[in-house]
Amino acid sequence: MTGPNPNKQAVELNRTSLYWGLLLIFVLAVLFSSYFFN
């Protein structure tokens, strides 16, 4: 458990931050589109 655990945790954290970044971009895109169409 002391071997591949930190590496796996780092990859999982990186993937989570990537998903949060994509979600933030999606929300900003929706807000900008609502401003433009309004």
Curated annotation (Swiss-Prot):
TM annotation in the entry: 17-37
Predominant location category: plastid
Biological process terms in GO annotation: photosynthesis
Keywords: Chloroplast, Membrane, Photosynthesis, Photosystem II, Plastid, Reaction center, Thylakoid, Transmembrane, Transmembrane helix
Membrane topology recorded in Swiss-Prot or TrEMBL: Single-pass membrane protein
GO cellular component: chloroplast thylakoid membrane; photosystem II reaction center
Family recorded in the similarity comment: Belongs to the PsbL family.
Function comment: One of the components of the core complex of photosystem II (PSII). PSII is a light-driven water:plastoquinone oxidoreductase that uses light energy to abstract electrons from H(2)O, generating O(2) and a proton gradient subsequently used for ATP formation. It consists of a core antenna complex that captures photons, and an electron transfer chain that converts photonic excitation into a charge separation. This subunit is found at the monomer-monomer interface and is required for correct PSII assembly and/or dimerization.
Annotated protein name in UniProt: Photosystem II reaction center protein L
Organism: Thalassiosira pseudonana (Marine diatom)
Lineage: Eukaryota, Sar, Stramenopiles, Ochrophyta, Bacillariophyta
